């Protein structure tokens, strides 16, 4: 094993042989469930935004050269930049069982921490290869924490993409942190926890809004530094900033925290509903809430109006990729006048998305899971104006004359909150404008 720098309820349906699609019911609306061939992106991708967020953490992937090349390409960094992630590459002797994987991990970690003494939190990240040969990273993390715990905490999680969507890498990472969160004192005042990785600028915006409402005790998970892990307890109320954090939410609830039901903070409507859930839970009066949120709502509404001419009346089709599909469809339909033909999602968490589902029009087809060939047939037949899909489908669809938007770009870009509402709308408008310019 060599070290190479930077090259549930929340789980999607397991893949299987293609079968006839089945219809279920989600609330009072039909839901198309599909099982078959599906396209996914690797869960290791979450490291790209997580390593930028937790500034004293390091992510050590136990994987293959393919993992190393993926990370270098996805992150857009060079080896000499020494980013805070790397791949311990499984060699032939590791795969053949000729070397003790646990000893090799110990050796690589010791070298890493000697070279990078600034690391305070080390994640051992499982991959498809390490899971196939069943390397016990949880045992390795417990052992290494005893050895290096005075200076560096060691935690493990799986970033494998075998049966998950790429955003669930973040879910697995945050869920692994929850057991290490300190316990809040029983007599402490209620506090608010925002769960899900947000760009620092967005986190600061939300922090200011909560403070202006009088919610002073606000924390974010993940924090910017591992030494600032938030304390949680029965008086903790948490808001999910991302819809793909089912495991993390379940772990927080097991420790006594309570989730605040809310739509997700995309666009004016979603952001206002999300903030209102916190305001109601912490006793903020309506006058204060309206005063604090009015400037942001007005700025966002003006920004959205600039994109409405491009998007209004256009038809959009979502392939399942990130679990962001339902909140984004709600945003496009209700705030920009688009028509959603099909909203595909890898997994539909009914409780976490209840507020979003209530806002969707009954005409939109919801689909859970995927049989990619059948879904492509439906997409081609519908001829939508815009398709939101993964990288693997985008180029073939573009070659057929169908305009596409890469779904992964919606995860990498700041899109939450009032100030980013216009940017979010522009991400969808840009492919349509490009297509119009290319027409002869």
Curated annotation (Swiss-Prot):
Pathway annotation: Porphyrin-containing compound metabolism; bacteriochlorophyll biosynthesis (light-independent)
Region (Disordered): 1-24
UniProt keywords, alphabetically: 4Fe-4S, ATP-binding, Bacteriochlorophyll biosynthesis, Chlorophyll biosynthesis, Iron, Iron-sulfur, Metal-binding, Nucleotide-binding, Oxidoreductase, Photosynthesis
Record text on cofactor binding: Binds 1 [4Fe-4S] cluster per heterodimer. The cluster is bound at the heterodimer interface by residues from both subunits.
Amino-acid positions noted as binding [4Fe-4S] cluster in the UniProt annotation, renumbered to this chain: 42, 67, 128
Catalysed reaction, written as an equation: chlorophyllide a + oxidized 2[4Fe-4S]-[ferredoxin] + 2 ADP + 2 phosphate = protochlorophyllide a + reduced 2[4Fe-4S]-[ferredoxin] + 2 ATP + 2 H2O
Cofactor(s) this protein requires: [4Fe-4S] cluster
EC number: 1.3.7.7
GO molecular function annotation: 4 iron, 4 sulfur cluster binding; ATP binding; metal ion binding; oxidoreductase activity, acting on iron-sulfur proteins as donors; oxidoreductase activity, acting on the CH-CH group of donors, iron-sulfur protein as acceptor
InterPro entries linked to this entry: LIPOR_BchN/ChlN, Nase/OxRdtase_comp1, Protochl_reductN
Origin superkingdom: Bacteria
Enzyme class per UniProt: oxidoreductase
Biological process annotations from GO: light-independent bacteriochlorophyll biosynthetic process; photosynthesis, dark reaction
Family per record: Belongs to the BchN/ChlN family.
Function according to Swiss-Prot or TrEMBL: Component of the dark-operative protochlorophyllide reductase (DPOR) that uses Mg-ATP and reduced ferredoxin to reduce ring D of protochlorophyllide (Pchlide) to form chlorophyllide a (Chlide). This reaction is light-independent. The NB-protein (BchN-BchB) is the catalytic component of the complex.
Complex formation: Protochlorophyllide reductase is composed of three subunits; BchL, BchN and BchB. Forms a heterotetramer of two BchB and two BchN subunits.
Name by which UniProt lists this protein: Light-independent protochlorophyllide reductase subunit N
Species whose genome carries this gene: Rhodospirillum rubrum (strain ATCC 11170 / ATH 1.1.1 / DSM 467 / LMG 4362 / NCIMB 8255 / S1)
